[in-house]
Each structure stands twice: as C-alpha cells, then as structure tokens.
Swiss-Prot record:
Entry GO MF terms: DNA binding; sigma factor activity
Segments of the chain annotated as binding DNA: 631-650
Domain of life (superkingdom): Bacteria
Gene Ontology CC terms: cytoplasm
Annotated region described as Disordered, given as residue ranges: 1-45, 229-260
InterPro entries in the cross-refs: RNA_pol_sigma-70_dom (IPR014284), RNA_pol_sigma70 (IPR000943), RNA_pol_sigma70_r1_2 (IPR009042), RNA_pol_sigma70_r2 (IPR007627), RNA_pol_sigma70_r3 (IPR007624), RNA_pol_sigma70_r4 (IPR007630), RNA_pol_sigma_r2 (IPR013325), RNA_pol_sigma_r3/r4-like (IPR013324)
Subunit structure: Interacts transiently with the RNA polymerase catalytic core.
Protein name in the entry: RNA polymerase sigma factor RpoD
Annotated spans, Sigma-70 factor domain-2: 436-506
Chain spans, region Sigma-70 factor domain-4: 604-658
Family label: Belongs to the sigma-70 factor family. RpoD/SigA subfamily.
Pfam families: Sigma70_r1_2, Sigma70_r2, Sigma70_r3, Sigma70_r4
Length: 671
C-alpha cells in the first residue's frame, strides 16, 4: 500500500514539474517573440531615420529664381547658372535669365569677379566688427576683474596646462556641424579649382603628373584620391627588406595584381585624355572670333559651360587638398613681388648635396638649361638618383616663373581677379579646417595619454597627434556617414605611433621591426603571466611564426643603449664610462714588460762592438724613428759597401744567438 502511495505521489510530482516546464517554455517563447518584434520595430525605425528625406526637385526656372533671390551681392556668376542647368541654356532660358536680372537688379559676371565682390563685402564686415568691438571696450572702460583673472591664468608656467586650459574653452561639434564644415571646405576648394581652370598653364601643370601616376611614383601618392594607395601599402614597402621568404608570392596573386595594375593604368590614361580634350575645347571656344550677331550672354554662358566641363574632368581625377595647395603655392610664389621665387629656389637647393666645387659647377650648368631638359637628360647629368625629383621640381619652378613673367597669358585685370578668387577659396576652406581641427583637440590629448612613457614627452605626442588630425581634416569625406572623430582617431594614432618609432629610440628601428618586437613582447608577457617565468626562445619563435635566429636578432635589437654618463654608485661620484676598457691604451703590465724588454735588449747590444751595434739598431728599427733600413741605406750612412753591411749583420746575429744572451730574451717572445 505504501509503495502504491509513493508511486502516485511521484507521478503527481512529475506531472506538476512537466506542467511547470511547459509553462516556462511558453513564457520564454513569448518573451523571445516580443524581443524579436521589438528588434524588428527598432530596425524599421532606424532604416526610416536613415532614409533621406524626399526633397522636391526644383525646376530650372524655380532654381534660377532662388539663385537670384538669395545672391549675397548685386551680382550672379555665369558658373552658378551653368551648375543649375548642367548645359548651355536654351533661348527661352536665356530670356528668363534676362528677366530675372531686371527684376532683382542683378549683374551677370564671371566667378572670379563674383569672388572679388564677395571679398570686398567681407572686408567691410570685418572692419565694422572690429570697430564695434573697440567701441564696446571704450564704453565699458577698464575691467579690473578681467585683469585679475588674466593674472591668475598666467601664473601657471606649465605649457601643457596652459594649452589644456585654452583647449577646454572650445566647444565640441555635432554631426550636423561637422557635415556643414566639411561642405565649407569643399566649397572653398571648389572656388580654388574654378580659378585654376581659368589658367591653362596650371592645367598643364596637373597634366605633367600623368607619367608619375602611371609609374606609381611616391611623390604623387597623396595628390590624387582616386589613385592613392592605402597607408598599409606603405608599410608593406618597408617590409620588403625584412625577409626573402616574404618575396615569394603565389602566381595567381601576381596575375590579380597585374590585372588590377593594368586597369589602374587604363583609368589614369582615360582620365587625363578626357582632361586634355576638355581643355582643348575650352581654349577653342575662348579663342574663337567674336561674332557681333551672337548674343554676348550666350557666348559667356557657353564659355562658362566649357570651363565647367573642364572642372568636372579635373574632379574625375579627385585632386586632394595637398595638390590644390601645391598649385596655389606655385602660382603665388612666382607672382610674389620680391624674393618669393628666390626663397623657394633656396629651399629646393637645400635638399641637394652640393658639398664640393664639382657638384656646384654641375648644378649651375643644369640650372642654366633646365627648362629645355627632359627627365632623361637630368638623369644623365646628376650623380645620384635621389636628386632627380628635386631637379624636376626646380624645372617646374623655373617654367612657372617664365609663365608668370608673361602673366600666364592672361590680362593683368583678369589675373588679379583669379588671385582674388583663390584668396576667397582659401579663406573659406582654411576657416572651416581650423574650426574642425580646434574642436577635436581634446580627442588628440585623450589618445596621446595612452602613448605616454614610450620615449617621447607628452607635448611632443600632442603635436604629432595634431599633425595626424590635420591630415584627417584634409581627407575626411562626410558622404560616407561616419563621424569625424571616428575617422580622425585612426590618423591620430598612426601619426603618434609613427613618431614614437622614428624619434623615441637613440638608434632608429624600422616600423616593420617594431611590429615584430611588439608581437614577441606580447607572447613573452603572456607566458610570464601564465607560468611565472620567461619562456624559451624556441617556444616564442614557434608562437610568433619566425625562425629562432630571427627571434634572437630581434631581441638583440630591442636592447637600449646605455649612456657613458650614467652615474654609478650611491654617491654619484662615478660614471659608467670610467669603467669601460679603452682598447687603444696599452695596459700597465704590457707597458712594464716592454720597458723591461728595451732595457734587456740594450744590455745585450752592449756586448757588441760599436759598428755591429749600429748595424743591428738600423736594420731592425731600434732607433728613435723605429724604421727598418735596407743594407744599401746602412752602407751609405757607414760609408761601407752593401756586402760589408751584410757580413757585419750576420756576425752580430751569430753572437746574439749564443745561449748566453738568447736565454735572457727568450722569456719576452710573447710580447
């Protein structure tokens, strides 16, 4: 009976447990479904948020009306009209443009004239703002509280603290503000490119990079985005010296690389061909005879369209900020009154190893005819291959100087307008770049803190990080949807780590070697933490994937040099250099032995007669000049024949070989 009762209880318990498990499973399923539905809803919301808000596309007339209504000055540029129409306007559209000019009292001008007008407006605004600030200061009088704050601020003599205090006053940017600043940078560069397209010489200047791009020369690596290799490839270049094993690649991979390179070369050639064609069409339209029957507005808009096409072809090459700055610098350097050209010439000449008269004479000879020389001519005349790129830059400088003397084939007024346009573009882009860089200085400091105690002072780390930040500002593309700080972090880290690799050690180690050192150190730290002792080098070599000899060499490289001025002892009265053996100085024991040997030789020679003694001394270099003389030289000094000298020498040596004297000198044979 008891058994039956126990069995029934067990069955009931099992049923209740099964029910509980089933209900629990149902609950978890419901919870999972609820979670999945929430995730789906959130994803749908995110997708909707990311979807661009549909913008109503304006018609040509509406866009034109908006352009005239929102113009900042009493002018509208031909180029802005072409950007709306994307082609030469029709007669009906030209009629509409004329109507809007009368309605809004606007004048149609070129983009360079428009930039000049805007520069004048900005100048007036700037002077008004300055005057307003001065007036406010005069009204407020002298503020003693501000002076007190300034004194407290200036008490800290630490440059780091002063820098951090100033940096803290700058506000951080939102994502929308970053996008707006990025657009401002692009706008400034667009204005500069528009000005560049007005100077045929500068288009030829860009065209000269064609061969360098095809040959993948390092000097043009950062000038064009579309053909710019990743920085990782630059690291792979340094790895070429590491091992012969790494040079062996798969045949398939080689084929892929060659195909890729072939496509790249084709792309370069097509892009430059299109640029050359657009330039020729623009020059043809520019040089075409003016037809009096043709409407002046139609001609101006046609020229603007041709120039816009040229600019679009230039944009296809995706020039970087560095190239734009180089073009502007080239133009400004040669047009500067005074020593602008001479300064640039000296800067380039400083890179050349002109350390003797022959090289200087050769340099002057090359400069005398550099504008007519090809690259092959320069290679034939310079002693080092590294000098070729400098001479090519010198050639560009001289050609630009010649072009500038002729006003770049432009009227003086037109040249001034173009320079004003460049000035405006630089002002817009520089202002936006400075604001973006200043707003992210805190990011540099936060990253630099992680690299302290690596051999560089904190301020140096901040400065190197700032260089990386400026590169990030130049290369940032807001269209990809990333925040600037996310993109800039990589550049800042890369700049700091590169600086540590180059400057932190007394003896510089290549970057690829530092990567290997870090891998070995990581493995060794791991083993010390796990086993409490350093691992065998065989184990390290196996885990790192290198040979034992390679690991030994890397560990040797990691040893830091010790300064000879390092203090030794508790009282700091000695230096490490005092304990290093000088191999050039004779040891005291050797000195005593040598002096004793000289004395013994003198005592032995005293047993010979005067003539024998003189012959032995001269023959074996025992005089003060320590030079061995020939038999003939000794004979001349003693007024005897060569044969007689030989006889005297042999008789003297015979005497010295006797056991009586030989026993004395035998102990000195090791000296």
């Amino acid at each position: 009976m008891k058994k039956k009762a126990n069995e029934e209880k067990a069955q009931k318990r099992a049923k209740t447990e099964a029910k509980a498990e089933a209900t629990q499973e149902n609950k978890t399923k419901e919870n999972n479904k609820a979670k999945e539905s929430k995730i789906k809803e959130s994803k749908i919301k995110e997708a909707k948020a990311k979807e661009p808000i549909p913008v109503k596309k304006l018609s040509f007339n509406e866009a034109l009306e908006e352009l005239f209504a929102n113009s900042l000055s009493d002018c509208v540029s031909y180029e802005s009209i072409i950007q709306i129409s994307a082609k030469v306007p029709t007669l009906a559209q030209i009629k509409k443009i004329k109507e809007l000019c009368q309605k809004y009292q606007k004048k149609l001008v070129s983009s360079s004239e428009y930039a000049k007008k805007l520069n004048a407006i900005d100048k007036i605004k700037k002077t008004e703002e300055k005057q307003k600030v001065l007036d406010e200061e005069l009204e407020d009088g002298y503020d003693f509280l501000k002076e007190k704050d300034f004194l407290e601020w200036s008490r800290s003599d630490s440059p780091v603290r002063m820098y951090l205090r100033e940096m803290g006053d700058i506000k951080l940017l939102s994502k929308d503000e970053e996008i707006e600043l990025s657009k401002q940078i692009r706008l400034g560069e667009d204005i500069i490119l528009d000005a560049i397209c007005s100077v045929p010489y500068l288009i030829d200047f860009i065209y000269a990079y064609k061969d360098a791009l095809i040959n993948r020369e390092r000097r043009v690596k950062e000038l064009f985005r579309s053909f710019d290799d990743d920085d990782e490839n630059s690291v792979s270049d340094s790895k070429k010296d590491e091992d012969n094993e790494e040079d062996e690649e798969n045949e398939e991979r080689k084929k892929v690389v060659s195909e890729k390179d072939k496509k790249r070369v084709e792309k370069v050639q097509e892009s430059f061909k299109a640029l050359d064609k657009a330039k020729k069409e623009w020059l043809k339209a520019l040089e075409a005879p003016i037809d009096e029957r043709e409407d002046e507005l139609v001609r101006s808009l046609t020229l603007a369209y041709k120039r816009q096409t040229l600019k679009d072809r230039l944009y296809d090459l995706e020039p970087t900020s560095k190239l734009i700055n180089e073009l502007v610098k080239t133009m400004e350097t040669t047009l500067k009154s005074g020593d602008g050209f001479e300064k640039e010439l000296k800067r380039l000449e400083y890179k050349l190893p002109l350390f003797n008269d022959t090289l200087i004479a050769n340099h002057k000879k090359i400069l005398a005819n550099i504008t007519n020389m090809t690259k092959e001519d320069i290679i034939a005349q310079v002693p080092e291959a590294t000098m070729v790129s400098v001479y090519m830059d010198l050639k560009k400088l001289f050609l630009t100087k010649e072009a500038s003397e002729e006003g770049f084939d432009l009227a003086p007024n037109k040249l001034k307008e173009i320079l004003e346009q460049i000035k405006r573009g630089k002002l817009i882009s520089d202002r936006a770049k400075n604001k973006m860089a200043k707003s992210n200085l805190r990011l540099v400091v936060s990253i630099a803190k992680r690299f302290t105690s690596r051999g560089l002072p904190f301020l140096d780390l901040i400065q190197e990080g700032n260089i990386g930040l400026m590169k990030a500002v130049d290369k940032f593309e807001h269209e990809k949807g990333f925040k600037f700080s996310t993109y800039a972090t990589w550049w800042i880290k890369q700049a700091i780590s590169r600086a540590i690799a180059d400057q932190a050690r007394t003896i510089r180690i290549p970057i690829h070697m530092i990567d290997t050192i870090n891998r070995i150190n990581k493995v060794m730290r791991k083993h010390i933490q796990e086993n409490g002792k350093e691992p065998d080098l065989e184990v390290v070599a196996e885990e790192v994937g290198l040979s034992l000899d390679k690991v030994k060499n890397v560990i040797k490289v990691t040893k830091e040099p010790i300064s000879l001025e390092t203090p030794v002892g508790n009282d700091d009265d000695g230096k490490f250099g005092d304990f290093v053996e000088d191999k050039n100085i004779v040891s005291s024991i050797d000195h005593i032995m040598r002096e004793d040997l000289k004395a013994q030789i003198e005592s032995v020679l005293d047993q010979l007669n005067e003539r024998e003694k003189a012959v032995i001394r001269m023959r074996f270099g025992l005089l003060d000049d320590e030079s061995d003389r020939t038999l003939e030289e000794i004979g001349k000094e003693l007024n005897v024949t060569r044969e007689r000298v030989r006889q005297i020498e042999s008789s003297a040596i015979k005497k010295l070989r006797s056991p009586q004297y030989g026993r004395i000198l035998r102990n000195y044979l090791r000296i």
